[in-house]
Amino acid sequence: MQWEVVIGLEIHTQLATQSKIFSGSATTFGSEPNTQASLVDLGMPGVLPVLNQEAVRMAVMFGLAIDAEIGQHNVFARKNYFYPDLPKGYQISQMELPIVGKGYLDIPLEDGTIKRVGVTRAHLEEDAGKSLHEEFNGATGIDLNRAGTPLLEIVSEPDMRSAKEAVAYVKTIHALVRYLGICDGNMAEGSLRCDCNVSVRPKGQAEYGTRCEIKNVNSFRFIEKAINTEVRRQIELIEDGGKVIQQTRLYDPNKDETRAMRSKEEANDYRYFPDPDLLPVVIEDSFLNDIRATLPELPPQKRERFQAQFGLSVYDASVLASSREQADYFEKVVSIAGDAKLAANWVMVELGSLLNKQGLEIDEAPVTAEQLGGMLLRIKDNTISGKIAKTVFEAMASGEGSADEIIEKRGLKQVTDSGAISAVLDEMLAANAEQVKQYRAADEAKRGKMFGFFVGQAMKASKGKANPQQVNELLKSKLEG
């Protein structure tokens, strides 16, 4: 039997406010336990929450960016459940009237196509505290620094049909919230966490299968692995005659398996009701218009512009537009070098590889956009070849200066004098007389393969400095002669 995978995601984004959503406590990551917890965060009697307007502004900004309905009358509700790191015994969230309603995201896929994924809603809520198990020898410590940190929970429609589509969706959200400046997107620190709702059904069946939720997955790689692992588990279970039970599960990356955490709750299990301590939030048109006027050019628009203006593929444009800093870097390189496709290749491949090796973000790149643009100019005017450019790039990354300084200092200027190249070729061909003889006796198919050998020998003899185009032209003439 053929199976279809159905995936919906809930993404918790920690909003980049300076203080918590209902108190004035700071939200700095990594502070000493319980040093950023006020009486409001601790749920002490007699204290009242006060809504942080900046959190509202950020939520509205996100809603406008995904072309969503904005709940201009939205209500906070109490979500009642017991957990040791939830001091009030309830979490302030939103249920029936969220701040952001239906919207959508267009996500770029690996095959160059664009898929539209619906967003059901996005609502504001407070984060819970954190349970600490390892430091207390069989006991559990509670750190309430995180309690009350503002979250925007983004709930998708079950529109994704593979783990790769799910990862593409999360990457699109990740890029968007960073563009907007509403979340730093640091998954390692928990700023962006994902719950994956996964089910399977026979191909062609309209009814959804029983879903399981995988909680708190915090990396793109683990999202893909967790979903694929859970899909395999469900299919094997059904094919063995079993039945999928609706559960909340955890993914164990060390064992590459999901395991049951608890039975999956429904909304009525939490006994939601409007929070009597918080008035309904009324959002005026003027507030919306002010926020709309501050929206930057967003990844989808930037991607489309890169395609139209620079002739880039959907994939290349999507990668380059995936972060604001990378897009700015690329455009600066293009403004200097004047060749978008060459710039895209160097930014994505050579610079990307360098940053990955050194564990750096693009705004920490050891090669500036001005330096890279200057080097690409030297490729375009034939001062250096593409191969020599890699040597120049490595030298720039090591702090040896600009491309022009390195080319001059190391004597890397490309040889374009036809006479000098011809002399190198004559010497190389004389040293490979037997291969020349074989080439001339060969048919066209074999000649094509052998020609590459001679080009390689010529570039080796010139120490990579000979102009490749001139080498090809002169070499062909000499071999055919």
Swiss-Prot record:
Disulfide cysteine pairs (residue numbers): none
Record bears the keyword tRNA processing: no
Enzyme Commission number(s): 6.3.5.-
Pfam families listed in its UniProt record: GatB_N, GatB_Yqey
PROSITE patterns: GATB
A GO molecular-function descriptor: glutaminyl-tRNA synthase (glutamine-hydrolyzing) activity
Name this protein carries in UniProt: Aspartyl/glutamyl-tRNA(Asn/Gln) amidotransferase subunit B
This protein's encoding gene: gatB
Family listed: Belongs to the GatB/GatE family. GatB subfamily.
Enzyme type, top EC level: ligase
Keyword Ubl conjugation annotated: no
Keywords annotated in UniProt: ATP-binding, Ligase, Nucleotide-binding, Protein biosynthesis
Catalytic activity: L-glutamyl-tRNA(Gln) + L-glutamine + ATP + H2O = L-glutaminyl-tRNA(Gln) + L-glutamate + ADP + phosphate + H(+); L-aspartyl-tRNA(Asn) + L-glutamine + ATP + H2O = L-asparaginyl-tRNA(Asn) + L-glutamate + ADP + phosphate + 2 H(+)
Entries under HAMAP family matching the protein: GatB
